[in-house]
A protein has these predicted regions:
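Hydrophobic/aromatic residues within well-ordered alpha-helical segments
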Residues: 1-3, 14, 18, 22-25, ...
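Hydrophobic alpha-helical bundle segments that form small-molecule/ligand-binding pockets
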Residues: 53-54, 64-88, 125-127
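Residue-level recognition of alpha-helical structural elements
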Residues: 14, 18, 56, 81-85, ...
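Short amphipathic alpha-helical interaction patches enriched in hydrophobic/aromatic residues
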Residues: 6-11, 33, 55, 75, ...
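Helix-loop "lid/cap" segments that line or gate small-molecule binding pockets
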Residues: 11-12, 30-34, 43-53, 74
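A general structural signal for well-ordered alpha-helical segments in protein cores
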Residues: 19-22, 26, 41-45, 57, ...
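Hydrophobic alpha-helical segments that form the core
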Residues: 40, 45, 83-102, 118-122
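Hydrophobic alpha-helical connector segments
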Residues: 7-40, 89-92
Length: 127
């Protein structure tokens, strides 16, 4: 499936709250880290970091943009205002990418757990 045109292969988010969306997002990566014995990470980040080829860089940029847009849409669907959903999605993806590097180095999901707690604090009070 083409990440650039359809990032929904990540699966539909079952959450109906903003906190649930972020927890779901963290859990996707937690499962990947655990399944790899702490050695996994984001393949797109690996390509982006090592890409000397402009075409690969463009593809990685498109994948990250698609994931950010999907996460923002899911946050908006739970009531997060559009002007907050995009930035929160961007911070979430950026934090997750850094956490994945740390998980690999530490061979632990603890960096993901820290990110999960701190991401929840970014959410606006929707009550």
């Amino acid at each position: 499936m083409d990440l650039e045109s359809d990032p929904r292969h990540l699966r539909a988010c079952p959450a109906d709250t903003a906190a649930g969306v972020l927890a779901w997002f963290v859990d996707l990566w937690r499962q990947a880290v655990l399944a790899s014995g702490g050695c996994g990470g984001c393949p797109v980040a690996g390509v982006a970091m090592d890409a000397d080829d402009e075409e690969l860089t463009v593809a990685a940029r498109a994948a990250f943009a698609a994931w950010t847009a999907l996460l923002a849409e899911q946050l908006q669907a739970t009531g997060v205002p559009a002007d907050r959903a995009g930035p929160i999605a961007a911070v979430a993806l950026t934090a997750m990418e850094g956490a994945l590097v740390m998980c690999r180095v530490e061979r632990s999901v603890e960096p993901l757990e820290t990110v999960a707690v701190e991401l929840a604090r970014l959410l606006p009070d929707l009550t």
